[in-house]
């Protein structure tokens, strides 16, 4: 569903930010 896609994109975004901070 749409919510699953939103959560998936949010997880990718958070992961990208975390990797950028490291």
UniProtKB/Swiss-Prot annotation:
Keywords: Amidation, Amphibian defense peptide, Antibiotic, Antimicrobial, Secreted
Annotated tissue distribution: Expressed by the skin parotoid and/or rostral glands.
Sites bearing Lysine amide, chain numbering: 22
GO CC, one annotated term: extracellular region
Superkingdom in the source lineage: Eukaryota
Primary residence: secreted
Transmembrane segments: none
Compartment(s) where it occurs, according to its Swiss-Prot or TrEMBL record: Secreted
GO BP terms in the entry: defense response to bacterium
Recorded family membership: Belongs to the frog skin active peptide (FSAP) family. Caerin subfamily.
Its biological purpose: Antibacterial peptide, that adopts an alpha helical conformation which can disrupt bacterial membranes. Each caerin displays a different antimicrobial specificity.
The protein, known as: Caerin-3.2
């Amino acid at each position: 569903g749409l919510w699953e896609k939103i959560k998936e994109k949010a997880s990718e975004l958070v992961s990208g930010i975390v990797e950028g901070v490291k």
